Amino acid sequence: MSSIPEILFRDVAKRFRATDPPVLQGIDLTIERGEFVTILGPSGCGKSTMLKLVAGLEPITSGQIYVNGLEPKNARRLISFVFQEATLLPWRTVERNVALALELEARSREDALQTTGRLLELVGLTNVAQSYPRALSGGQKMRVSIARALATKPRLLLMDEPFAALDEINRDRMNEEILRLREAGNWTVLFVTHSVAEAIFLSSRVVILSPHPGRIAHTISVDLRYPRTTTLRETVEFDTLVNQASRLLREAHRA
């Protein structure tokens, strides 16, 4: 592993206004290159806020955050963000939605088309490249969103409940898909979810926050081998980790 952490939180606190109580307090966390770390916690505990701080979308009230040794405002080219909503532009085709990030970088049309084609093949959407978002399923829209996020070749992928709107079957499929893509790209992932099973399936480590203010209450190492497939969910080892995480989440909620 690199001597420079991919993400480093040092005693981070966040208030949205000076008179507000803190949303986050005393956050210390180190995430190494290539880790898949998921944040779990009750609603309102600051999970999404942590991602926004890393992305530089919100200022830190106190403490420090570094992304590959840089302050978030200087690390934006290293980061891509995938939100719960796919936020595709309805007047652009799938191909042109993915190409948008490349156009913003002023890449040549030939380069943009080549990169877009490769990414659509990677996420299994070459057959809908000329379709518009209205013709896509929820899972397909999320794949387009992920392909667009990968277009700039990020080191770090921030994912804020990206599969929350999907049914269970499609959610499980997308869980496998994101692990397959990560295997090919070797990026670091910081992921937010409310699903304990999803967190255990995806992650190398799970961080559980307690609320009011959000603090790190527990950390779980998920010692399950990659690559992971849906059959993992049927194993005793998986059930044991899900039960452990659920118990710790309940404890954090009561804290």
Where do the protein language model's features map onto the residues?
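Conserved ABC transporter NBD signature motif
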Residues: 63-75
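Catalytic Walker B motif of ABC-type/P-loop ATPase nucleotide-binding domains
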Residues: 157-160
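Helix-to-loop junction immediately C-terminal to a conserved catalytic motif
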Residues: 55
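The feature captures the beta-strand-to-loop junction immediately N-terminal to the Walker
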Residues: 40-42
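Short coil-to-helix segment of the ABC ATPase nucleotide-binding domain corresponding to the Q-loop/switch region
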Residues: 92-99
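Conserved ABC ATPase "signature" region
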Residues: 99, 103, 110-127, 180
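Hydrophobic anchor residue at the start of the ABC signature
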Residues: 146
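Conserved signature/switch motifs of ABC ATPase nucleotide-binding domains
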Residues: 131-134, 152
